[in-house]
Amino acid sequence: MLSEVLYELSTAAHSKECKRSPQQFIPAGFPLHGQLPTGTEDSASPLTTPDMVRSGRVLPTSVKSPLNLAFRHPLLYNNYDLQLKSGKAMVEIIMQYNNIVTGTFIKRPNRFIAHVLIDGRETVCHVKNTGRLREFLLPGASLLLEFHPDAALQGRKTAYSVIGVYKDNTGFEHKRRLINMDSQAPNQAAAEWLAGGGLASAVTNIKREITYHDSRFDLAFSEDGHPAFMEVKGVTLEQDGAAMFPDAPTERGVKHIMELREAALEGYRAYILFVIQMKGILSFSPNRNTHPEFADALKLASESGVRILARDCIVTEHTMKIDMPVNVIL
């Protein structure tokens, strides 16, 4: 029976239903004034492939088993619906890292690379986060890295990517917490969260990177039949159980907030989701000391109808998944 369901899902993924142009997937009621990202129509990949089904890497959500999907699935880079339904079965996409190794942080000469001790050798690694990260990228810190065995063939300059760090929290309940520091992970986790029913309302037609006026929002979807936008911000800064954003001034972040506020004033449902890339967080607040303009913009957006959400994450060495609500203090 299970094999029949999986085959049906695979067949549906390759049907003409999944061959439509991105414009046909825009939720009803979206008066988009910009252009969809280039390349989506020709380069879009189907949700699943027969090989993935036969190997057991795609399962209906009713099967409580971890999925073994590559972290950068083609789905993440097109605007096709994240949910493929066949009867009551639905494909679930869960991000997962492969070839994880551990290392010890030595130094970070610039935003993009770090020197890490791996198996006794100092190795240059790519840092998948351009933030400052000064509070946990300290000499001797224990890091998680993803090894890329085909780095040379892929044209990569480094064979390792730093994706996580263990942070010691002296005097706090979680004395050693695992923090995911991959800046690409929050958007993927947010899309999965929406597709899995993260909002209490009925969400359909989830899209990535939709252009509206002169803006591009991380997520667009239909909520109870109403068009909605969502901006996603990954949070790695934490002190004594309080998460904060940003860790450095971000004019781009202020711009995103004001654009989302404009959409809310025009009648769209608008959300900002702060994805806290760790567990054990008591509260979230904008980092007013670092960027007061960001804090002011966030409060103004909230007063204008933008819904401010914060969620912590279950983080393992191989996965990150959005979990529980966190109290937002503006």
Question: Could you say what each language-model-derived stretch is?
Answer:
Residues H14-S15, S21-Q23, P27-G29, G34, ...:
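Targeting/processing segments of secretory and organellar proteins
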Residues L67, L75-E92:
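Short, positively charged and aromatic/hydrophobic N-terminal segments
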Residues E92, Q277-L330:
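Domain-level recognition of nuclease-like catalytic cores that cleave nucleotide substrates
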Residues G103, F217-P246, L260:
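Conserved catalytic cores of phosphodiester-cleaving nucleases, focusing on short active-site segments
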Residues N110-H115:
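Short aromatic-glycine-enriched beta-strand elements
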Residues E122-E135:
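Beta-strand/loop nucleic-acid-binding surfaces
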Residues G198-Y212:
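A short acidic/basic microdomain associated with nuclease active sites
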Residues G241-E251, M258-T290, D312:
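Nucleic-acid nuclease catalytic cores
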